[in-house]
Amino acid sequence: MTSAARKVSVLLGAQWGDEGKGKIIDFLIENHKINVTARCQGGNNAGHTVVANGRKYDFHILPSGIISPTCFNVIGNGVVVNLDAFFSELAHNGVLSEPGWEKRIMISSEAHLVFGVHSQVDGRQEDSLAAKNKIGTTNRGIGPTYSSKCFRNGIRVADLMADFEEFSEKYRRLVEHYKKQFPSIEVDVDGELARFKEHREKLAELKLVGDTVGFIHEQRTNGKQVLIEGANGALLDIDFGTYPYVTSSNSTVGGACTGLGVPPTAIGSVIGVVKAYQTRVGTGPFPTELFDADGEKLQSIGKEVGVTTGRKRRCGWIDLFLLRRSAMINGYTDIALTKLDILDTFPTIKVAVGYKLNGQTLTAPPAQTNAWGAVEVEYKEFEGWMEPTVGVRKYEDLPEKCRQYIQFIEEFIKVPIVYIGVGAERESLIVRQKQ
């Protein structure tokens, strides 16, 4: 690798997911000449919504750059790939009707495959937990697929593209492994294999599988701009999230390196996407969650319904104590603050600035699960601006009280807020110069 190779940018959700990453990625592709977008982790448990070209796109496993005719799209080795979902999503978003789409996407041969049996196991494992211990999984088989990867009986895309008899034997062994744990599982092995044979033929015909590590390094060497697109959110990271109520991969910046074969020294900027308030899907700790009219108002105005699950999102005030931790771990160089306009009609707005546990001020979030329930939140209160921000395109045109809110967040986490979302459309974005 030459020293002239271009640095990559990484975009991550800084909270519990659903921060509005798709909108920011879409803006960057259109305005910063992004040549390659790359997914590095997760699977079709993610959900990105992009509103562009007069229509709404929903992405779960596809990189958001797929809607741009000039952008190449990579699904990296760290992603777990459900091929049924992959082809279905291409059709649902109208990609298959675009000429030459297959020349703009590559799936890593080293990515692991998600099978129907993984989804069944996901559901069985969740059902076996007591109500208070349920994780709130999407039942897409993501966790069990990563478990197979670690157990070393996982099956990769390369296996599918090689000798099909060997692939079939590996698959049968995988099913038997799970049937020993869950005897009630019913799997149409022959039907599943027939479907994967069709997938194999389609992948080969369209030449969709390749060496994504080599491709990205080649693009960098040639001076192309690569944007790595994180899924889920930093507070759902398997190591640094609110364990065990987390996803099954590293959704922090380290996942960009391990999930694509990109060295840490190749990362030039890390953009953290932050919603102006806090949301969470499923179970797990949420110290600033609101159970009153304000919470219902955030849910209603913000249209807080999960793209992947269809579940209503839990809503609360933004948690700067957790956001500062997120910034510490990921080294954000820029922040994109989204959905600021949702707060336009709130006369009082709160932000969490600290935690106490048993009367003691905490310097870090609790590492022990049960401790979260006893956390006391320290808030700072702001007077709402009570003016519409939708349509504003310059930072100085925002209401003064709104700017005070933004400035406080910046100063608390010590990262500049460069992008401010004030509406769903692509153009509903304020771009600030770094101070």
From Swiss-Prot:
Its cofactor is Mg(2+). Its main location: cytoplasm. The gene is adss-1. Homodimer. Binds 1 Mg(2+) ion per subunit. Plays an important role in the de novo pathway and in the salvage pathway of purine nucleotide biosynthesis. Catalyzes the first committed step in the biosynthesis of AMP from IMP. Substrate binds at V307, T308, T309, G310, R311, K312, R313. IMP binds at D18, E19, G20, K21, N45, A46, G47, H48, T138, R152, N232, T247, R311. The keyword Signal does not apply. GO terms for cellular component: cytoplasm. It is an enzyme of class 6 (ligase). Pfam families: Adenylsucc_synt (PF00709). It comes from Caenorhabditis briggsae. Disulfide bonds: none annotated. This is Adenylosuccinate synthetase. GO terms for biological process: 'de novo' AMP biosynthetic process; IMP metabolic process. GTP binds at residues 17-23, 47-49, 313, 339-341, 421-423. Pathway: Purine metabolism; AMP biosynthesis via de novo pathway; AMP from IMP: step 1/2.
